[in-house]
Regions:
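Intrinsic low-complexity, intrinsically disordered or marginally ordered coil/linker segments
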Residues: 1-97
Length: 97
């Protein structure tokens, strides 16, 4: 299993440990806003989002409305995106609208 995330059509950022990004969706949902991979950075006490979903594409954080923390133990942490992963470690803060 892999640490993956998606942004649903309702703008929910959802985390999980799954084989495929589609496994994060319920039967009546779809994902138009992409996804990727995630990891917890213990040093920064933050969640790092990186990569893209082969099923749903690159994440569109402009469509993010809220974060569902259930898939990461329910603990809210700062979010950062690595847009150029794996080529550099630039971190861009991610926030909800």
């Amino acid at each position: 299993m892999y640490q993956k995330f998606i942004i649903t059509d309702e703008g929910e950022l959802r985390f999980g440990n799954v084989y495929h990004h589609r496994n994060l969706l319920r039967w009546d949902e779809s994902c138009s806003y992409g996804g990727g991979l995630w990891r917890v950075d213990e040093e920064r006490e933050a969640v790092i989002l990186y990569g893209r979903s082969f099923e749903f594409g690159t994440p569109e954080f402009g469509s993010l409305r809220y974060v569902n923390w259930d898939g990461i133990d329910g603990v809210e942490r700062p979010l950062f995106y690595q847009p150029h992963w794996p080529y550099d470690e630039t971190l861009v803060p991610v926030a909800c609208l």
